[in-house]
Amino acid sequence: MIHGFLKACTVSPALRVADCAFNTQQTIAAMQRAALDGAQLAVFPELGLTGYTCGDLFFQQPLQRAAAKGLAAVLEASAGLDLVALVGLPVAVDGKLYNCAAVVCHGKLLGLVPKTHLPNYGEFYEKRQFNPAPAGVRTLR
């Protein structure tokens, strides 16, 4: 930090719908570039490990497992970086699916932040796939 400020960046990597392996590679490469450029905080797209437009594929176990595997790879890659990254992925907890931002730093998962306000109009059908963050709940188990 310089004078109380940190360098932050938003990242828009090339993504492929439902191709978690490709999206994970793109995310890791962008994290490494951001850290080399001196960023201390990198914010990635919503549902970036799966792609936003997976629709009902979000309910499929193979996609959920691939996203979790991608997050594990991101965690491992972050171990040597001086960077906090927010990476988007779907997370299933107790039979409910959440649209989450994973907070990653130095090889650790610092938290999962489920989306609170889900749009349900026009091309946005998030309430079909996802549950909103439970009101007043600070921890998902």
Give short role names for the model-derived ranges.
Residues 1-141:
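Enzyme catalytic cores with a strong preference for nitrogen-chemistry domains
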